[in-house]
Amino acid sequence: NQIRQHHVPGKTVTWIIDRNSNTTNVCNANCKFCNFYRRPGHEEAYITTIDEYKIKIEETFEYGGEQLLLQGGHHPDLGLSFYVDLFKELKSLYPNLKLHALGPPEIAHITKLEGSTHIEVLTALQEAGLDSLPGAGAEILSDRVRRLISKGKCSGKEWLDVMRAAHKIDMTTSATMMFGHIETNTER
């Protein structure tokens, strides 16, 4: 708490209770550190169903949670319409649910699939019910490192471009950093 008060003075501390859920484990990003993904067509590949989301969301509400953190792989067949439909359905079933979903690499992937722009994709998702954008997939924003551990994801520059686009449409974002692997202290 002393460190927090040094950086963020004041007596108010907030947090949110959320639930992580994966939209799909199908991914073609080939991250070296991922034990989660499956190739398209793999027998263990899945896309989470609405019934599975209902169970997870209702459990989240039972425990006082209010937000669903949705992440997933770079599925080659799940474009913008899939996520727009998913977000609309989840919000129609649970209007008070906060959707903190996808991340810059997923937005970049969808943008590429659609031949669109980051702003167009983010705006469509926001209109469908996306409340905020998690900062997943940053790993380390060094392209040297990214080429070695997650070369199928967007560049560090594109990750930042997606975040800038989100901020232009007044979307709240967060950011994460994965460190302690092959990066140098300077790259941190």
Feature roles, as predicted:
Residues 2-41, 45-71:
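N-terminal pre-triad scaffold of radical SAM enzymes
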Residues 1, 186-188:
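Short, intrinsically disordered, charge-balanced linker/junction segments flanking boundaries
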Residues 12-14, 23-24, 48-49, 60, ...:
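Residue-identity detector for threonine
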Residues 65-174, 181:
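Conserved SAM/AdoMet-binding glycine-rich loop
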Residues 22-23, 41, 75-78, 180-184:
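Glycine-/small-residue-rich active-site loops that bind phosphorylated ligands and cofactors
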